[in-house]
């Protein structure tokens, strides 16, 4: 079996930055305890489990405000997905110490929405409902931001002005966004478009589109909650024309997927730890359908290997 290691794949700079911020917080003895992450720091359970070992508690829930209601003291880390001004204000009112790990690409979109609101615009925001990134973006200006996920959402959308900006969640499929923007253009011809697919998402999607077409199967390593991982599987199937499965780690690979397969493409979401992806590749490289000794699929990567290393500051 030949393995096509799609490149680039895996961690993006926004994810690494967020994890380094959280790890440094865990090492900072001056921060009030306990330390919480408001939602998953990035959408990967292996990462959140590793942070639990670092003493950082991940709290998840339907919305950031609802999660915040569970916290009465300590330090709160805002995730890479960003939060609304209301969440920041509520944390301040509760007297919590806050650390912002928002991805710079998300902050850029928030700033754009604020600027356009000041100019009297309404904003159509393309994103996944019940995902934290759109929650934060809509929360910047909920009175003028309209969240849509698919073309059907446009049927009932009415906007009381011709001044309309269209932007999007950074981890969407660039092809889905383009198609939706074309539909929006037809209904709102005066709309201005500002595509905000982050560069890391874009190049990973394009790599799958260009490199997965030579494979019989694509395996995307990523958490089920990771939108960018799920979009990579979608791109493989819809753009490259190659069947794809998303797995959280090697233990989720089903042997029947590999029957009759000669070429397997492997990629990983932007929040997937590199050791987890390497373990998947190592399994596929040694797999022999005729040798049961090669069939074991057990995640063995220790949690200590999941998070990026940070330098420990020496006490003066």
Curated annotation (Swiss-Prot):
Coiled coil: none annotated. Belongs to the IspH family. It comes from Bacillus cereus (strain B4264). It is an enzyme of class 1 (oxidoreductase). (2E)-4-hydroxy-3-methylbut-2-enyl diphosphate binds at residues 43, 81, 131, 170, 226, 228, 271. It comes from the Bacteria. The gene is ispH. Its cofactor is [4Fe-4S] cluster. [4Fe-4S] cluster binds at residues 12, 103, 198. Catalyzes the conversion of 1-hydroxy-2-methyl-2-(E)-butenyl 4-diphosphate (HMBPP) into a mixture of isopentenyl diphosphate (IPP) and dimethylallyl diphosphate (DMAPP). Acts in the terminal step of the DOXP/MEP pathway for isoprenoid precursor biosynthesis. Isopentenyl diphosphate binds at residues 43, 81, 131, 226, 228, 271. GO terms for molecular function: 4 iron, 4 sulfur cluster binding; 4-hydroxy-3-methylbut-2-enyl diphosphate reductase activity; metal ion binding. The active site is at 133 (proton donor). InterPro entries: LytB/IspH. Its EC number is 1.17.7.4. This is 4-hydroxy-3-methylbut-2-enyl diphosphate reductase.
């Amino acid at each position: 079996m030949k393995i096509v290691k799609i490149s680039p794949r895996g961690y993006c700079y926004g994810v690494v930055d967020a994890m380094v911020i959280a790890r440094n917080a865990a090492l900072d003895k001056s921060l009030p305890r306990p330390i919480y992450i408001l939602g998953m720091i990035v959408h990967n359970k292996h990462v959140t489990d590793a942070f639990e070992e670092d003493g950082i508690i991940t709290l998840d829930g339907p919305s950031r405000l609802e999660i915040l209601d569970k916290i009465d003291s300590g330090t709160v880390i805002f995730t890479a997905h960003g939060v609304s001004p209301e969440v920041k204000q509520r944390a301040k009112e509760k007297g919590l110490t806050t650390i912002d790990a928002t991805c710079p690409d998300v902050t850029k979109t928030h700033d754009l929405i604020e600027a356009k609101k000041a100019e009297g615009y309404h904003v159509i925001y393309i994103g996944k409902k019940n995902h934290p990134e759109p929650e934060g973006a809509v929360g910047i200006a909920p009175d003028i931001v309209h969240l849509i996920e698919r073309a059907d959402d446009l049927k009932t959308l009415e906007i009381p002005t011709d001044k309309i900006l269209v932007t999007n969640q950074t981890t969407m499929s660039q092809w889905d966004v383009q198609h939706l923007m074309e539909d929006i253009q037809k209904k709102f011809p005066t709309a201005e478009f500002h595509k905000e697919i982050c560069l890391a998402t874009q190049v990973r999607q394009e790599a799958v589109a260009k490199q997965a077409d030579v494979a019989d199967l694509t395996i995307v390593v990523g958490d089920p909650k990771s939108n960018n991982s799920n979009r990579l599987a979608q791109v493989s199937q819809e753009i490259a024309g190659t069947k794809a499965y998303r797995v959280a780690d090697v233990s989720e690979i089903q042997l029947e997927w590999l029957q009759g397969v000669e070429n397997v493409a492997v990629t990983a979401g932007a929040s997937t730890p590199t050791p987890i992806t390497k373990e998947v590749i190592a399994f596929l490289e040694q797999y022999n359908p005729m040798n049961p000794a090669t069939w074991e699929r057990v995640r063995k990567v220790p949690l200590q290997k999941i998070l990026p290393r940070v330098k420990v500051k020496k006490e003066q």
